[in-house]
């Protein structure tokens, strides 16, 4: 919505400029008398740039630029009808593709008033010579590639009314000389890389109506001198690094229609002087550090259309007076500390209000039946509060409602049938238990999130009618029965499918042949049997597969190697069997980052080159986001932490970094040597090969894994010495060599000395453990432990379920589990953040 408002004021300023140019053009009527010096200057100017198609198109429109025609008739050129002097050059979108030279012939046009070079692909610095064109009233260099500082000489243009330098790559400080432009009406410097403070001299521009300095790197406080701009209509300072309190003088700007300070570090209270800004239609203070309550009755802003104070620390009761503003269309109050119940009985905004976003506050009580008064409501978000009771039946009167998010409350009862007509329904983390019966034949939901409720029985048949479904999360419920094959009805559109943590039985239907958009599939923690669906080979967009903790009985799906984007594969705790390696499978998992196939019945050996093509574990690719991320039309992005921000899904643990790499082959029957190619995986953080039958010595190439943090090779048949080279792995915080046939000295080194004595148990020939085992009193920990204690040790690294943040609700799971039940849970907490100690064997994430 903020983007929409931003475009609104940009569009308004463009209209002002367009009308100004139109009036000027109409005033310059025939006859035209082009002066030779003006014509020659224009031709020389054109000669400074390569000829290209855009010039050709321009010439066809109003005639060619050449000596045989009147230059006053040339495209983009306007002359004074008396003197023949060129007074306007308006050639946007001509893609000049060159520098604007300091000695350009453009600067011979001394009587130029209007200069519009919008989107001409100009680069280099803005020539200081521009300041010599003293008649200029408009300079528009919008959307080019100009670099360097804004020339101070522009401050000499005392006739200038419009200065538009936005969307370039300008650096340096805003020159204080701009304060000399006493006739300036429009100043647009947004979307550059300007630094420093906003100069006080900007407050001298008494005629200014539009000031946009958004999306730069400006620092310091908002100067109080801006309060002198009594004609200002638009004030946009978003996306900078401004600090301190907003000066009370801003309340002097009584003509202000648009005020946006979004995404800075402003703090303190809202000045009480803001009560003077009664003409505001757009009021945005979001993503700052404002505190306290609103110091005035909000209904005084009787022209307000868009109100956004989200992502601050405002407190106090829900500001009901906002609902008395008849023109209000959007209210964004999420991520604050508002308290109390909400009520809509006394509202004047029932016919206008479209967006009501109240998520992540401290609101409580029932959802009022008076919600039905908001007849035009399209989006309602009251997630992450303490609302109780049932969804009121009056919600059926909101016939325009498209997006509903009630997640993370204490709501209960049945889901009204009318909600199937929505586009987005997010009801996760409540206590809903059933669905109202409906005869509805059609449903248009694209995003449906019912996770973490108390639903039971078979999947609602209405889900089978969602032919456009893109996101479905039914996880953490009590659904039972078979997974219906009718999910093929939306297989062509589904991207995220999470049915994990239910009681589904039967087979996983092999119905994914048309699921070419599928990104994430999670059916973990059910009772599914049978084969692994081979139709997944058609899902070329697939990034995550999690079938953990089922009863699937099949051979290893090596054909998944062909999926170009598969990052996470979790087959843990099933009945998979047979060898991992097939001689016809030669591609390798090139994109795999996390694999967990532990606690199955895999057997056989791995050839030395088995990991040779696992490229994503060898080198990191440059990625924009730090965390695995997915974007949805209705939901915000989900990196930084794996919780829903707008209309998505919550998770129990925090995000996982994109650079995390892990392999867990533990609890199988794999034998032979540890493959040599494992040493190529230099980005690997976790390696668990425990509980197999690997033989020979511990390979020295493991010392090549310089980012390794966890190494568990316990409960194998490894012999020989522990390589001294492993002591050089400075990130290695946990290792386990117990229950092997190792001998010789334990390497000296800080990482080894910090391990627990149990990490070396049952290796009869090991010695040098005096310092490590001093606290236990077992200086020679080589005897076989009782079976139950041994089992506890070997399960220490069942590290399943570290999550993967794929986007507006993707499903994930993988890499956590028994870290939290063992002495090493501190390591996991440090890496992934603290939340409730709620999932001991797995973690649910919705990407």
Swiss-Prot record:
Q: Which InterPro entries match?
A: Leu-rich_rpt, Leu-rich_rpt_typical-subtyp, LRR_dom_sf, LRR_N_plant-typ, LRR_R13L4/SHOC2-like, Plant_LRR-RLKs
Q: Where in the cell is it found?
A: Cell membrane
Note the topology in the membrane. Answer: Single-pass type I membrane protein
Principal location listed in the UniProt entry: membrane
Q: Where are the transmembrane segments?
A: 799-819
Cellular component aspect of the GO annotation: plasma membrane
Family under the similarity heading: Belongs to the RLP family.
Put simply, this protein is called Receptor-like protein 12
Taxonomy-wise, where does this protein's organism fall, top ranks first?
Answer: Eukaryota, Viridiplantae, Streptophyta, Embryophyta, Tracheophyta
